[in-house]
Amino acid sequence: MPQHDQLHRYLFENFAVRGELVTVSETLQQILDNHNYPQPVKTVLAELLVATSLLTATLKFAGDITVQLQGDGPLSLAVINGNNQQQMRGVARVQGDIPDNADLKTLVGNGYLVITITPEEGERYQGVVGLEGDTLAACLEDYFLRSEQLPTRLFIRTGDVDGKPAAGGMLLQVMPAQNAQAEDFDHLAMLTETIKSEELLTLPANDVLWRLYHEEEVTLYDPQNVEFKCTCSRERCAGALKTLPDEEVDSILAEEGEIDMHCDYCGNHYLFNAMDIAEIRNNASPADPQVH
């Protein structure tokens, strides 16, 4: 059995092409545990999680990537946020009924894919592409074609392992400033496309690479762990409250007695009473009662 929740990078010795392989199980489960999503939405979040992990691994700097689907369908929003340390979180918003056999276009409707790259230092970049492909992988390949100009292929698989949801994926990309032959890249993509869900989700990474590329010379690097981690905090909530008009905050306090800030990603609640709000307005740091 493979070690899930790990990302592996690999290089082809004889081609200017690099690859990534990721499998997720526990990270996915933690994202899904906080909500009661229909199965098709769980599948979309699993695919988004895999895609975001693969994309963050392409970053050459410290920062994060947010990959989100938005549309006018019953799945109005699905988003995964991850950073270069492979710390992930995600959430979806569902409006209306979703049939069990709903595909991506049925779920999202008329929509688009938004990819936001936020370096810790430097300018933020955002790319938007319409959902013209039938799969998330196809839409992401369209994004790469339009933005990076680097030939890129993604292969995403979802399923169950020991009764728990799992997902995996592989990314192939021509190395920047390298002259990879188109036929070489296409050859490697054809090999990678043969990967089955069962193989990707149940075999160790080196076995997967052997099955796909046993006639090629491939270097597999040490893996990087993938984990669920939310970036919410009481301080961030206090900062958000500080931006609201005093009248609006006071009205909620008068009606409710306290303000309950809820994080959609992890389910944490942060409670603020009148004394906390007074401290926030005085630029003090309020006490830290946090409800899970």
From Swiss-Prot:
Name of the gene encoding the protein in the UniProt record: hslO
Entry-linked InterPro entries: Heat_shock_Hsp33, Heat_shock_Hsp33_C, Heat_shock_Hsp33_N, Hsp33_helix_hairpin_bin_dom_sf
Any GO molecular function: protein folding chaperone
Taxonomy, superkingdom: Bacteria
Entry GO CC: cytoplasm
Disulphide bridges, residue numbers: 230-232, 263-266
Primary residence: cytoplasm
GO BP term, example: protein refolding
Gene3D superfamilies according to UniProt: helix hairpin bin, Hsp33 domain, HSP33 redox switch-like
Post-translational modification: Under oxidizing conditions two disulfide bonds are formed involving the reactive cysteines. Under reducing conditions zinc is bound to the reactive cysteines and the protein is inactive.
Function: Redox regulated molecular chaperone. Protects both thermally unfolding and oxidatively damaged proteins from irreversible aggregation. Plays an important role in the bacterial defense system toward oxidative stress.
SUPFAM superfamilies, A to Z: Hsp33 domain, HSP33 redox switch-like
Protein name in the entry: 33 kDa chaperonin
